[in-house]
Amino acid sequence: MATCADILRSEFPEIDGQVFDYVTGVLHSGSADFESVDDLVEAVGELLQEVSGDSKDDAGIRAVCQRMYNTLRLAEPQNQGNSQVLLDAPIQLSKIMENYDCDTKLPGLLKREQSSTVNAKKLEKAEARLKAKQEKRSEKETLKTSNPLVLEEASASQAGSRKESRLESSGKNKSYDVRIENFDVSFGDRVLLAGADVNLAWGRRYGLVGRNGLGKTTLLKMLATRSLRVPAHISLLHVEQEVAGDDTPALQSVLESDTVREDLLRQERELSLRIAAGRAEGSEAAQLAEIYGKLEEIEADKAPARASVILAGLGFTPKMQQQPTREFSGGWRMRLALARALFARPDLLLLDEPTNMLDVRAILWLENYLQTWPSTILVVSHDRNFLNAIATDIIHLHSQRLDGYRGDFETFIKSKQERLLNQQREYEAQQQYRQHIQVFIDRFRYNANRASQVQSKLKMLEKLPELKPVDKESEVVLKFPDGFEKFSPPILQLDEVDFYYDPKHSIFSRLSVSADLESRICVVGENGAGKSTMLKLLMGDLSPVRGIRHAHRNLKIGYFSQHHVEQLDLNVSAVELLARKFPGLPEEEYRHQLGRYGISGELAMRPVASLSGGQKSRVAFAQMTMPCPNFYILDEPTNHLDMETIEALGQALNNFRGGVILVSHDERFIRLVCKELWVCENGSVTRVEGGFDQYRALLQEQFRREGFL
């Protein structure tokens, strides 16, 4: 096949050497920039027109460019145009020069000394156009990572019910049950739910469970925005975003969430002022009396005390309850959003992973509080103990459908196993029955005497319901690489460490802790007690004000932050993310690393922003383990992970040959992994000999003393 150089020589035999070198250089170095033949014509067309001496018209020049463009595209996969070749032997330029006299010109230079018949200005313009095109392409690549990615939004559709529509429009629908039948939910071209039904009975507490990325959070959003039709008379609240910070005190912010009470108080103030000023009409005194009656009915005078109890249960001290909301961090504002929802008492409360923002103490309080919740709750949670404590029903999202189960999570596990076992038995029994009938049909298909029986058997097969084999969810397996040499203690320790950000507020005083490669340590304590600060001291990210941090010279720490999503570039794929962090490896290596944590196939090539919370966590695990650390420090690693992945993470940490220190609020995960429990409080860290059972008992006793139980 002719090369671009061959095409140039055959079409333009008189082409100048300098122009020939320039055009071939443009063709090879800029081939990636030619998205169409028009780009190639724009780059070299004028030069070739000049070279032809007007012997070729525009169509002729375009035809030549088309031939060269086709040649470039065909050669592209091999990518051999600019490949480097290893020489068989070194070239000695001095030996070559000996064959020429001093006045003799080298052959290559003779060509370059020939006069050029091409307009120099046109040559400069062509070079400028090519440079501009390359800059434009580079700018596109920069924008790809700097601009926030615009993701597709979820959509929902559902079958309508004329009866329900008539009841809704007439105002006769007084039921507080939520019943949505035969609906679909999709995210772009991905179908999350197809022909699904959801039934939420008034006063029941539903736990919504399922693997990461199947659409649990999306379903909550569809309900919260009423994209799925929820009766208009049912009030609902979705705890999703943190409270905006302003000068409103935390306690007042919670009180304002009860819009009915706030509206009545506003009317009471306005009427009282009018009556006091002598401007009231005769009926307004009666209106004021009616408002007082309504305020008494909703126990408005007890509202501040009730709001204060909720805030205290979620960890707000009396001083914090009077602080402006703008002074709180994002985590505390999320707690404030939860407090507002609990205080407002909607007919349908939607909670998405509420325990992620809470410490163990606040979770135990929330469990106790929700057990007496009067209306309906739908909560997404991967905390088994939390669901066992609060759920009356479980909704399982899988295979694009929703299956309902009565009872808490442990009851759900047993019921699901029994259902799957029965489903498999029914399927196998029907398959045997079908085979038995099919044998009869095949045997007597061409027997005229048995024709009626064969037809009868065929009809029997047609009438049998179509049973499908059980969809078994794939097992989640995680493994942390541990191909490193063991080394002797001391491995990692803090000795008599003092630390503070502000000298007036000490965080740690004379802190002494240590860990080795056998350690499985869990750190618990209230938010703000210094758990994350201690982890940063152990890693060396923070330096002690006084005292010593000692780390073994061979120690290699892998760190998982509870804010790991903020450290990921959300605009690129998971594969590209690893390639940028650890350059120089083949793409298959990055894919293999991601596959170890369940990010495989199409998932690995999707923008990280489009992944679910749990899938983003898996990407963070893949990134953390890539350098093969021998010690892991994990800050809330179970946030957003589904239950199967939490179990797999626990097993992987137990099998890991190095050391582990983690902060977690997940009781089951703590019991699964940890051999040692540290409690962080009052500027120190103490070891609890009785483990989590003793710590839980201490918290329950504290609740009783404070009047929460």
From Swiss-Prot:
Residues the record lists as N-acetylalanine modifications: A2
Taxonomic superkingdom: Eukaryota
Protein keywords: Acetylation, Antiviral defense, ATP-binding, Nucleotide-binding, Phosphoprotein, Repeat
A GO biological-process term: defense response to virus
Gene name of the record: Abcf3
Family membership: Belongs to the ABC transporter superfamily. ABCF family. EF3 subfamily.
Binding site for ATP 2: G525, E526, N527, G528, A529, G530, K531, S532
Transmembrane segments: none
Residues that bear Phosphoserine: S83, S155, S157, S161, S283
Identification of the protein by name: ATP-binding cassette sub-family F member 3
Cited PROSITE patterns: ABC_TRANSPORTER_1 (PS00211), ABC_TRANSPORTER_2 (PS50893)
Functional description taken from the UniProt entry: Displays an antiviral effect against flaviviruses such as west Nile virus (WNV) in the presence of OAS1B.
Positions of the UniProt region annotated as Disordered: 129-171
The ABC transporter domain, residue ranges: 178-424, 492-707
Residues holding ATP 1: G210, R211, N212, G213, L214, G215, K216, T217
Species this protein is from: Mus musculus
Coiled-coil portions: none
Biased composition, class Basic and acidic residues, residue ranges: 129-143, 161-171
